[in-house]
């Protein structure tokens, strides 16, 4: 019965994925060469419980970081909100900018902003989400095994031409300018 109360007859829906927060002209391809630290700064939710549990997918990745002397530094935005500038800075200086989805996000095909932002900030796009990989048309690395993802990403993280192509793809297809154009095309 709850479903019926939200049903609207003859109403078309428009679904839009997230995008990077950069406008196309803000992309700086020199960010590919940004000095990286042997650390990963992750600003986002990591939860061991609930519907959006994602610790089970982060744990293997974090273990491989530790085995390889890469410090994984987590900032919970709910207990310690950072400015957008600080999140960008921390991501840029990270050795990797990864997008790791939990089981529920994988199941429902959630496409977050994180991967688009990481790529636009000069990082190799890396994800465990088949839907994200599909949305980026292969312009990122994919591994369902997040422990193995660490090694795949570390090996490819200095493939600057690949990263540049991914940045160009996001610049042309995944900014809010693209989202606005998509909406306008329906009017």
Language model features: what each stretch is:
Residues 1-69, 174-178:
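Catalytic core of nucleotide-activated saccharide and alditol-phosphate transferases
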Residues 7-14, 18, 59, 73-187:
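Catalytic binding pocket for nucleotide-activated donors in carbohydrate/polymer assembly enzymes
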């Amino acid at each position: 019965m709850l479903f019926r109360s939200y049903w609207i007859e003859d109403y078309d829906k428009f679904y839009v994925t997230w995008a990077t927060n950069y406008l196309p002209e803000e992309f700086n391809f020199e960010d590919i060469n940004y000095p990286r630290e042997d650390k990963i700064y992750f600003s986002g939710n990591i939860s061991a419980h609930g519907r959006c549990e994602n610790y089970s997918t982060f744990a293997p990745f974090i273990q491989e970081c530790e085995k390889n002397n890469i410090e994984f530094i987590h900032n919970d935005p709910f207990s310690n909100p950072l400015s957008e500038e600080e999140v960008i800075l921390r991501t840029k200086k990270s050795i990797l900018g990864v997008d790791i989805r939990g089981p529920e996000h994988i199941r429902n095909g959630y496409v977050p902003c994180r991967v688009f932002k990481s790529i636009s900030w000069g990082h190799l796009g890396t994800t465990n989400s088949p839907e994200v990989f599909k949305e980026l048309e292969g312009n990122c690395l994919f591994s369902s095994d997040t422990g193995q993802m660490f090694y795949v990403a570390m090996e490819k993280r200095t493939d600057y031409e690949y990263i540049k192509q991914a940045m160009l793809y996001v610049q042309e297809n995944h900014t809010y300018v693209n989202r606005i154009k998509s909406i306008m095309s329906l009017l």
